[in-house]
Regions:
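Short catalytic helix/loop segments, enriched in acidic residues and glycine
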Residues: 25-39
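Active-site-adjacent betaalpha module
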Residues: 1-7, 35-39, 44, 56, ...
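Short, glycine-rich nucleotide/cofactor-binding loops
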Residues: 21-28, 112-116
């Protein structure tokens, strides 16, 4: 059976990223891959979580009062799916995401979205540090060309690949959409790499699909069940009013 505790996390798949001011982007088919995965999750009744960035930058197209803050229609939420709004790069900082995953006993995440090197990377790193098993889908994420401190411009594809390389094996397992879907089609395939264990009790079982054969992430010590979470970061600001769960 498909593991019930594996959630699809769609990070910042918002209309504002179509703004030409972002510049040249890689992976033009990323949203199509996201839509494929979203449909697969829905078909199997697996949990889906949408993350929406509400920027406080007055020049950002992702400001909550602008049309660009809206989630893209092709991957938008259904009424029963959870939407969590954030104001910083990590989807975990001062949002109800971790508490929701705790309540639902979700121990593994499949992460897709925008952009690879900013909110996707930050969310993946924090999820790994919190003890979740994380899978990042390489062709369902994307980024933009960026300038370095020395004035050199780096291509979106180079930035994308470097971030995938730095995340894989340390914070997550990176794999393609086709490999992930092949694993789902296996029916009993666990979304767990060899040698890893679920964050909490779950129904994952051994298997041998492409997912199971891939090198798994190495995590730090897990937080013990029942242990109080760390207090909110003093750097941040209270985003609780901006986090919501749909019915």
């Amino acid at each position: 059976m498909i593991p019930r505790r594996t959630a699809l996390l769609l990070v910042d798949v918002q209309q504002g990223f179509d703004d030409p001011r972002w510049g040249i982007r890689n992976n033009p088919e990323a949203e199509s891959r996201m839509a494929e995965l979203l449909q697969a999750w829905r078909d199997r009744g697996l949990p889906v979580i949408h993350i929406q960035h509400c920027s406080t930058d007055p020049d950002s197209p992702l400001r909550p009062d602008l049309p660009g803050a809206a989630l893209k229609e092709a991957t938008g939420p259904r009424p029963e799916e959870l939407v969590i709004q954030k104001r910083v790069n990590s989807a975990f900082i001062q949002t109800p995401l971790e508490a929701h995953l705790e309540r639902q006993d979700i121990s593994a995440l499949v992460v897709v979205g925008l952009t690879t090197d900013h909110c996707v990377s930050t969310t993946v790193r924090m999820a790994g540090n919190l003890g979740f098993t994380v899978f990042l889908v390489s062709d369902a994420t994307a980024t933009f060309d960026r300038g370095g401190v020395d004035g050199h411009w780096y291509s979106a594809e180079a930035i994308h690949q470097i971030h995938l390389a730095s995340l894989h094996g340390e914070f997550c397992t990176v794999l393609s959409c086709s490999d992930l879907l092949a694993g789902l089609e296996g029916g009993s395939e666990p979304l767990l790499p060899p040698g890893s264990s679920p964050r909490r009790g779950s129904d994952f079982q051994a298997g041998a699909s492409p997912l199971h054969r891939m090198k798994g992430p190495s995590f730090g010590p897990e937080r013990r069940q029942g242990q109080e979470p760390a207090p909110p970061s003093p750097r941040g600001f209270n985003t609780a009013p901006f986090a919501k769960e749909l019915p």
